[in-house]
């Protein structure tokens, strides 16, 4: 059984037991979080597609950790002007483990 849900402006395809990195959530480590914006739920033979959400659909997860992703380096420059600018960014994330999918 798998589901597609929306969190942080992104869609994630998950199954029970999967560990997923999401945009940072303000939830303590070890707490349980529920995602009710479920777009699709599928088990072996049936697929429930929401319009836009699946009625009664819920994905339950446990917060494993918080952290920062690898650094992304941005370089801007202007040709022939001896001008360049180098910047970096590390995005915060929350790692969750999917414990249940309800349709």
From Swiss-Prot:
Keyword field: Ribonucleoprotein, Ribosomal protein, RNA-binding, rRNA-binding
GO CC annotation terms, alphabetical: cytoplasm; ribonucleoprotein complex; ribosome
InterPro entries: bL21-like (IPR028909), bL21-like_sf (IPR036164), Ribosomal_bL21 (IPR001787), Ribosomal_bL21_CS (IPR018258)
Record-level GO BP terms: translation
Gene Ontology molecular functions: rRNA binding; structural constituent of ribosome
Subunit structure: Part of the 50S ribosomal subunit. Contacts protein L20.
Family as reported in the entry's similarity comment: Belongs to the bacterial ribosomal protein bL21 family.
Record's function text: This protein binds to 23S rRNA in the presence of protein L20.
PANTHER family named among the record's database cross-references: 50S RIBOSOMAL PROTEIN L21, LARGE RIBOSOMAL SUBUNIT PROTEIN BL21M
Name used for this protein in its record: Large ribosomal subunit protein bL21
Organism: Shewanella sediminis (strain HAW-EB3)
Higher taxonomy: Bacteria, Pseudomonadati, Pseudomonadota, Gammaproteobacteria, Alteromonadales
